[in-house]
UniProtKB/Swiss-Prot annotation:
Entry's Gene Ontology BP terms: translation
GO CC list: cytoplasm; small ribosomal subunit
Family per record: Belongs to the bacterial ribosomal protein bS16 family.
Keyword Ribosomal protein among UniProt keywords: yes
UniProt-recorded name of the protein: Small ribosomal subunit protein bS16
Location of region: Disordered: 87-109
Species assigned in the record: Rhodospirillum centenum (strain ATCC 51521 / SW)
PROSITE patterns: RIBOSOMAL_S16
Originating gene: rpsP
InterPro entries: Ribosomal_bS16, Ribosomal_bS16_CS, Ribosomal_bS16_dom_sf
Key words of the record: Ribonucleoprotein, Ribosomal protein
Gene3D superfamilies listed in its UniProt record: 3.30.1320.10
GO MF term set: structural constituent of ribosome
Chain intervals with Basic and acidic residues compositional bias: 100-109
Length: 109
């Protein structure tokens, strides 16, 4: 059984609230989970202390047992210094504007 630390959505329509849970990776996103280890409220300001609340001791225990955090949860854990901060993804060069688009931008601006 592969165990993940991930977000489980709650709240109302257009008012999301997430629980940070430890769950079987094959279980539905909002379905059965093993343990709730924190909360994430994206509706409060970034610097608010209740935006991300973590039970650090329980998370450390699950990480020691081999639970894998999802990308978003890994960022939360990195900011809390529970794991090394994951590397930010660089924008690939192929998505940069091509020569013709750059010429148009120079002409317009």
């Amino acid at each position: 059984m592969s165990v993940k630390i991930r977000l489980s959505r709650g709240g109302a329509k257009k008012r999301p609230f997430y629980s940070i849970v430890v769950a079987n990776s094959r279980a539905p996103r909002d379905g059965d989970f093993i343990e709730k280890v924190g909360t994430y409220n994206p509706m409060v300001p970034h610097d608010h202390p209740e935006r991300v609340v973590l039970q650090e001791d329980r998370i450390k225990e699950w990480l020691a047992k081999g639970a894998q955090p999802t990308d978003r949860v890994a960022r939360f854990l990195g900011k809390a210094n529970l794991i090394p901060m994951p590397a930010l993804r660089e924008t690939p060069k192929k998505s940069a504007p091509k020569a013709k688009a750059q010429e148009r931008a120079k002409a317009a601006g």
